[in-house]
Amino acid sequence: CSNLSTCVLGKLSQDLHKLQTFPRTNTGAGVP
């Protein structure tokens, strides 16, 4: 990555997208 902040934001957005698209039936899995 050329820009660290861009990298971090990219990873965070990807993680958030995964959480949002994660099946709600598995509530508690990977959730604090």
Curated annotation (Swiss-Prot):
InterPro entries the record matches: Calcitonin (IPR021118), Calcitonin/adrenomedullin (IPR021116), Calcitonin_CS (IPR018360), Calcitonin_peptide-like (IPR001693)
Entry protein name: Calcitonin-2
Pfam families referenced in this protein's UniProt entry, alphabetically: Calc_CGRP_IAPP
Function per UniProt: Causes a rapid but short-lived drop in the level of calcium and phosphate in blood by promoting the incorporation of those ions in the bones.
Disulphide bridges, residue numbers: 1-7
Source organism per UniProt: Oncorhynchus keta
A molecular-function term among this protein's GO annotations: hormone activity
Lineage, uppermost ranks: Eukaryota, Metazoa, Chordata, Craniata, Vertebrata
Coiled coil feature spans: none
Localisation: Secreted
One cellular-component annotation, GO: extracellular region
